[in-house]
């Protein structure tokens, strides 16, 4: 990759100079990039953030993350405010090439924290758009296309391989989308309650109605008023299912379920996972698990 060396990257050997190191900001970017660079020699993909509890907005860079970043030629991020944890350090890597996967994609206005009452105290992330783009299969396909196009531009010697791999992966995602539409388009009960603002793009794509969201943060709990409001919505709309996420505690959901008789299910927005060779199909696998969960939860 000509002219794409990070000024903070050490050149220890000829071998290291010949290897293109791509770093992804978090797991969904890692899965997409892994598929795009599949079987291309001298191109490695490293994921920076580790599996965690809570929202990526609250992530703090570790010493290991900074070392990984210092060895990167290209950094692939979701963008749309998702990687705010990079804001204070990214200027130190002036020659690092950054690919923003969500660039040019139509985004949904962020309603996160809007319904929070004054007594629910935590830091406002102050984002104008919802960053959870990849949770929509269609928009994830757009992100894959964007990544492949930018990689092809930055590393033209492998452009054909990037595009070929991207097209193969996109075909799999298109099949997944068709499978999910064939089931979810015919579900009668489409009102859902979620416990984080991760699913607006998914809901928009598959015609689900998010009638209530209760925010869960690692260092705080929703206010009593927020919980009461959600309980009122559940009773008013006869909601039978509450959807939590695997990276958050289900404590509040358990309380609401006891009050309303609703059942608790888990939907995975695929924010975290193990960054290894088994990750290639993890997006598809977890989306199929989400489909099975929705079929079970909304069949009444």
Q: Model segments located where?
A:
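Extracytoplasmic metal-acquisition and chelation regions
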Residues: 4-300
């Amino acid at each position: 990759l000509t002219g794409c060396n990070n000024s903070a990257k050490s050149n220890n050997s000829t071998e290291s100079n010949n290897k293109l190191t791509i770093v992804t900001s978090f797991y969904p970017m890692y899965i997409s990039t892994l598929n795009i660079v599949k079987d291309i020699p001298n191109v490695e993909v490293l994921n920076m953030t580790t599996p965690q509890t809570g929202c990526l907005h609250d992530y703090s860079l570790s010493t290991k993350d900074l070392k990984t970043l210092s060895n990167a030629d290209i950094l692939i991020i979701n963008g749309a405010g998702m990687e705010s944890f990079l804001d204070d350090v990214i200027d130190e890597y002036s020659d690092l090439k950054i690919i923003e996967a969500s660039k040019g994609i139509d985004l949904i206005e962020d309603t996160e924290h809007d319904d929070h009452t004054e007594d629910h105290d935590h830091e406002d992330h102050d984002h104008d758009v919802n960053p959870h783009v990849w949770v929509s299969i269609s928009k994830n396909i757009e992100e894959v296309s964007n990544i492949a196009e930018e990689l092809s531009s930055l590393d033209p010697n492998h452009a054909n391989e990037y595009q070929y791999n991207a097209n193969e992966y996109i075909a799999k995602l298109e099949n997944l989308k068709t499978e999910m539409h064939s089931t979810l388009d015919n579900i009668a009960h489409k009102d859902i309650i979620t416990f984080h603002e991760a699913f607006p793009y998914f809901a928009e794509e598959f015609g689900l109605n998010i009638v209530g969201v209760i925010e869960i943060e690692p260092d705080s709990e929703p206010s009593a008023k927020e919980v009461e409001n959600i309980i009122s919505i559940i009773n008013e709309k006869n909601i039978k299912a509450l959807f939590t996420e695997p990276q958050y505690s289900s404590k509040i959901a358990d309380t609401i379920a006891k009050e309303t008789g609703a059942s608790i299910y888990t939907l995975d927005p695929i924010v975290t996972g193990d960054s290894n060779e088994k990750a290639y199909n993890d997006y598809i696998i977890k989306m199929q698990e989400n489909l099975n969960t929705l079929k079970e939860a909304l069949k009444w």
